[in-house]
């Protein structure tokens, strides 16, 4: 029976006839129908008998393993589709929905979270970096979400004309959970941010499972700078603000080193500003020593301080410090110029200091005599030689001239008592007694307070001495005096001015000698062009003055006037000696002022009387 049964089975197998052993066939058919739609794993042979027999033999595998395989296959397909490497056909989707396992697959696909990040307007380097497969694989590995490129690059005009099915370039991100998608999107945003700006681009987007556009804001910012990798250093260079402050001492005195004053010792001033503010500060322009790389020489601009800083606030702080530095330098230069201006007159007009020290000089004259003391003084007095420099020195003495004139008339009573004594005594004693004993106490304050005004009042003493000497000695002395140009004469005035003032005060009692003495003083004040002629006239005048009586005063005045014409005095208006005669000499003052007016071409003696002090000496 067994053999017959075996033969029947073989016959049934060959002839397609079925036996009772073929009943389990429908079970494998169910498995086939469920396992066939697995994508990428099709089974050959749809449902013929041979296949059913083979599957019935392998039916030992449990049905749960098939379900697990179907689930794994669905998951793999979902990952491939998320990466864009597998695009499911519509018929496959229909099969998935038609088959028994379709609802489970659809459920897993609905669980994927999708997000979109637009990269159409980011800089070119960012766009190239994000569309590279290597970058997208790195993002997928770090985040667990799939990243793919969608759409195409569009310009602004193309975006305005875009059709409904066309979209600008963007990144498609999808993952199993929202956290994975957020992680991928944040990484994309970080890459874009590093390429565009340092600041944050905005809050992270929220996903509700639908398509979300994450990145729109940086579009206008990115248009400013096309280069992304070089952006941070290039941005810092572009944003450097700079300014310049001109020193303003282009015409400074050469001895004032402007560059050194501004930079400080070892450039310490500018380095301090750099340390305080972080700015770049250095000198440029003429005289700065800064060589321009383009021209190989200093800039043609005046010297200035160049300031540059990345931020306007730092530039303002550095500029303020530089302004303070320049103010200090300008103040120092002003003090320097004031010192120069005060030192230069002292060098050119050293005689005021020497004149102020004259009160000690009379001690030389009494001891050595007039002639011996005379050569000692000329060297310091040589700068006084220009006659036109004297008016510049006279003004300080003029305010004192009224004091001198008032004090001298008050001292007139004691002066006549001493005047005859000086005439009677021998020449050597007269040179000592009037200077040392009687007249120094009265005239000392006048000498100290008059730096230059004493010069006009001093001259007459040589004449007083000459009246006391013999006729020959004054001649030699006068010629010797006039041989020295002008400085020695002024020195003589300084040394013998005390007795001359007393003699001027005694003009009321001795008018004849006074007139000759005044003429002599005027002659020596402004030396005449021809010295020998003047010396002869002065000698004759002196002789007549010594031997004349008070009754011959008018005659002396006339002779003095004619001699004044011969002198040709340079205009020397406002001398203190003239004012002295106007107050001290009664008749002699009027005649002498007329003589001066003839020599000076003065308007009239009345105007001289009105104008006691010249206009440039008015206080």
Curated annotation (Swiss-Prot):
Sorted UniProt keywords: Cytoplasm, mRNA processing, mRNA splicing, Nucleus, Phosphoprotein, RNA-binding
Location of region: Disordered: 1-58, 488-619
Comp. bias regions, Polar residues: 493-503, 588-610
InterPro entries (UniProt xref): KH_1_KHDC4/BBP-like, KH_dom_type_1_sf, KHDC4_KH-I_first, KHDC4_KH-I_second, PRP5/DDX46/KHDC4_KH, RIK/BLOM7
Domain of life: Eukaryota
Pfam families recorded: KH-I_KHDC4-BBP, KH_12
Family designation: Belongs to the KHDC4 family.
Assembly mode: Interacts with PRPF19.
Protein name: KH homology domain-containing protein 4
Source species: Gallus gallus
Lineage: Eukaryota, Metazoa, Chordata, Craniata, Vertebrata
